[in-house]
């Protein structure tokens, strides 16, 4: 996955720090391309690739945050961007090379 996606023209992937469990793959649309997340979601759906929102995104804006004791020092523009332009594709317990190829190639008619 990392090898196919590291220089992707539309999608940024996470920078791994340490050893990731890779339960899934986060995908974030690169800034400045004029591509909407809804366009990306539709192309993934057409390719029969299931996806979900990134769990946290900007957690400070989630409804549950009002129940937690917390403080936010300032705006969180990166978290807002991930919340608006990111998504998550689940991994499997068996190899899925054909899905990884589909994910890395789907953008050709969206960009």
Walk through the language-model features, giving the residues of each.
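PLP-dependent aminotransferase class I/II
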Residues: 1-111
């Amino acid at each position: 996955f990392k090898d196919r996606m590291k220089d992707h023209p539309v999608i940024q992937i996470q920078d791994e720090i340490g050893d990731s469990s890779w339960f899934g793959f986060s995908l974030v649309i690169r800034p400045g391309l004029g591509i909407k997340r809804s366009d990306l979601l539709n192309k993934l759906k057409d390719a029969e690739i299931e996806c979900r929102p990134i769990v946290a995104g900007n957690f400070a804006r989630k409804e549950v945050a009002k129940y937690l004791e917390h403080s936010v020092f300032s705006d969180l523009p990166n978290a807002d961007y991930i919340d608006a332009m990111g998504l998550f594709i689940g991994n499997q317990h068996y190899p899925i090379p054909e899905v990884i190829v589909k994910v890395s190639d789907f953008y050709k008619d969206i960009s």
